């Protein structure tokens, strides 16, 4: 495979396609794993769980998590506060 073949790898991933693992999400957002697991346990987010595999998140979920993490980290909103904001 030459360089032009490698550079031509171009494809679309739908915004709702679950492709990001928990580890990748945490690394991209700078979010501790325990926060992500808490949000899942509290039903604030609902990742896809393929049989016996890690949780997977879509770009849409990543955007939602980014907003949630901003509120938690910068505005000091608690998990219960996030629930009130999202589910009122």
Spell out what each predicted region is:
Residues 54:
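Conserved catalytic core of two-component sensor histidine kinases, primarily the HATPase_c ATP-binding
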């Amino acid at each position: 495979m030459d360089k032009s073949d490698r550079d031509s790898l171009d494809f679309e991933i739908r915004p709702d396609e679950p492709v990001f693992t928990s580890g990748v999400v945490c690394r991209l957002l700078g979010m501790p794993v325990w926060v992500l697991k808490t949000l899942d346990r509290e039903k604030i987010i609902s990742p896809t769980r393929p049989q016996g595999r890690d949780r997977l998140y879509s770009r849409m979920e990543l955007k939602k998590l980014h907003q949630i993490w901003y509120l938690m980290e910068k505005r000091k909103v608690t998990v219960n506060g996030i629930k009130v904001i999202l589910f009122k």
